[in-house]
Amino acid sequence: MPNIKSAIKRTKTNNERRVHNATIKSAMRTAIKQVEASVANNEADKAKTALTEAAKRIDKAVKTGLVHKNTAARYKSRLAKKVNGLSA
């Protein structure tokens, strides 16, 4: 437990940010899983709407620095490839 006032504040801030980051990352993962579930069930329309939601969540994670932009691009590319494979 920190004794210095600024260190106490930083600990509190770090805990708040950790929880906030975890919720954003969790929402991103959930959106990705929804796309993959739709693809597995051969639901093309549902997969396309889920893909736009997943892309939005992934981009928000990039904007806040949770995920590297290249990693996000890879996620989105793989999901798009799966969704496009349904309609083909």
Swiss-Prot record:
PANTHER family: 30S RIBOSOMAL PROTEIN S20 (PTHR33398), SMALL RIBOSOMAL SUBUNIT PROTEIN BS20C (PTHR33398:SF1). Transmembrane segments: none annotated. Binds directly to 16S ribosomal RNA. GO terms for molecular function: small ribosomal subunit rRNA binding; structural constituent of ribosome. GO terms for cellular component: cytosol; small ribosomal subunit. Keywords: Ribonucleoprotein, Ribosomal protein, RNA-binding, rRNA-binding. Belongs to the bacterial ribosomal protein bS20 family. Gene3D superfamilies: Ribosomal protein S20 (1.20.58.110). This is Small ribosomal subunit protein bS20. InterPro entries: Ribosomal_bS20 (IPR002583), Ribosomal_bS20_sf (IPR036510). It comes from Bacillus subtilis (strain 168). GO terms for biological process: translation. Pfam families: Ribosomal_S20p. Part of the 30S ribosomal subunit.
